């Protein structure tokens, strides 16, 4: 059984499908995405395995890799991963919005929807999110989603072999 489908009326969080492969592969070649992520851009053929890997991650209880889709037409707008940590009761969220959907509040909506579900339905005590200190768009989206800034983690994040500072945020049940 797959993870639930969640919606706020504007966006939908759902499991990956094989039909999402081309959109995910295309978006992964975006220069801004490449600058922020270390992953090698997937080919559509290898990304088709993403649906199977997402289901395995959910079944293993290690995370929930959602596709963010437009509620009106189910078009993929980005990815949201709820990573369940080794610390029971804690999780982290990471979001990537496809270039054509940026600037429309998609990231903040997805972060809030995923965090609320984790806190309310999974009974998590804490959901964290982080952003590089120079990633103003991500910081704004996380704050707009209601996360509370906790501080700077020095040399915490690594991208392209370089360590850099990240801003740490969290949402706990009393924040809802």
Model-derived segments and their meaning:
Residues 53-54, 117:
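A generic secondary-structure signal
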Residues 1-32, 65-176:
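Acyl-donor (CoA/ACP) binding surface of acyl/acetyltransferases
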Residues 54-67:
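A short helix-loop-beta-strand connector motif used in the catalytic cores of GNAT acetyltransferases and
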Residues 28, 37, 58-59:
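Hydrophobic residues in alpha-helical segments
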Residues 32-53:
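Conserved GNAT-fold acetyl-CoA-binding loop/helix
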């Amino acid at each position: 059984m797959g993870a639930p489908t969640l919606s706020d009326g504007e966006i939908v969080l759902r499991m990956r499908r094989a039909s999402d492969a081309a959109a995910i592969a295309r978006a992964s070649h975006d220069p801004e995405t490449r600058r922020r992520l270390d992953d090698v851009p997937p080919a559509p053929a290898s990304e088709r395995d993403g649906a199977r890997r997402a289901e395995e991650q959910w079944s293993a209880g290690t995370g929930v890799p959602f596709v963010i889709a437009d509620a009106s037409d189910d078009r993929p707008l980005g990815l949201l991963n709820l990573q369940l940590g080794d610390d029971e009761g804690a999780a982290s969220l990471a979001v990537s919005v496809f270039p054509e959907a940026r600037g429309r509040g998609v990231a903040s909506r997805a972060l809030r929807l995923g965090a609320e579900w984790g806190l309310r339905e999974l009974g998590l005590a804490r959901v964290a999110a982080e952003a590089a200190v120079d990633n103003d768009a991500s910081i704004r989206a996380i704050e707009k989603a209601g996360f509370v800034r906790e501080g700077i983690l020095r040399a915490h994040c690594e991208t392209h072999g370089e360590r850099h500072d990240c801003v740490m945020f969290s949402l706990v049940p009393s924040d809802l």
